[in-house]
């Protein structure tokens, strides 16, 4: 598949409309600018063409994510990054075009945070494997994985499939957009925020490209 001219697909009216509707369905909290999902439609009506042109000319600049801590089952804290609703809209538009491309590379028995797949399917597959005589289950958690993702390595993997420089540029900009912690800005030179684009799994799809290809 030719992936050298994906930005025009991302900027198509149909794709942008679908992205807007998905962000509204996802709801979620406001980012650092305080804009709510309910305010997004009016904002895009006034500024949508400006955003499209900024993306087309590589001038779009994502805002920092807002740091939020949520409790983990083991008693610790998990850091989430909440993007602005406008950034979520752009991320969603990008993801809708990229996801079908990368889905073809993922392992058939990987069920986490993928379209048309769910935990119940994973359980059924595990039962099938147990019935085939497999008796071991290994539970592995990669400690602080999202906090330590190497940007250059991630973008190298990403670039093996995606050849559109405009798309590569905007994805990297989201990686280095920074984070606001108690009104203090911090650079993000490593790692990727959990939250935003796919708030239900708390991991942007470009991280799946890093860990999930077969």
Specify the residue positions occupied by each region the protein language model found.
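N-terminal alpha-helical targeting/anchoring segments
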Residues: 1-47
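Conserved polymerase palm-domain catalytic core
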Residues: 54-69, 73, 105-117, 121-214
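Electropositive, glycine- and tryptophan-enriched low-complexity nucleic-acid-binding patches
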Residues: 91-109
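Amphipathic alpha-helical blocks
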Residues: 39-61
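Duplex nucleic acid-engaging cores and interfaces of nucleic-acid transaction enzymes
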Residues: 86, 90, 127
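Conserved phosphate-binding loops in nucleotide/dinucleotide-binding enzymes
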Residues: 79-84
């Amino acid at each position: 598949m030719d992936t050298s001219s994906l930005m025009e697909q991302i900027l198509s009216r149909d794709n942008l409309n679908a992205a807007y509707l998905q962000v509204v369905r996802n709801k979620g909290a406001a980012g650092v600018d305080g804009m709510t999902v309910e305010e997004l439609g009016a904002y895009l009506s006034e500024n949508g063409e400006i955003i499209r042109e900024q993306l087309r000319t590589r001038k779009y600049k994502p805002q920092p994510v807002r740091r939020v801590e949520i409790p983990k089952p083991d008693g610790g804290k998990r850091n989430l990054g909440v993007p602005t609703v406008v950034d979520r809209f752009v991320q969603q538009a990008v993801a809708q075009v990229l996801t079908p491309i990368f889905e073809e590379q993922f392992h058939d028995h990987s069920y986490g945070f993928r379209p048309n797949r769910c935990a119940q399917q994973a359980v059924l597959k595990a039962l099938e494997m147990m019935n085939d005589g497999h008796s071991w289950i290994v539970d592995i958690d990669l400690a602080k994985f999202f906090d330590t993702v190497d940007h250059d390595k991630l973008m190298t993997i990403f670039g093996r499939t995606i050849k559109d420089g405009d798309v590569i540029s905007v994805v990297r900009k989201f990686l280095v957009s920074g984070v606001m912690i108690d009104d203090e800005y911090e650079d993000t030179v490593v790692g990727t925020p959990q939250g935003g684009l796919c708030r239900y799994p708390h991991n942007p799809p470009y991280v799946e490209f890093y860990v999930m290809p077969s």
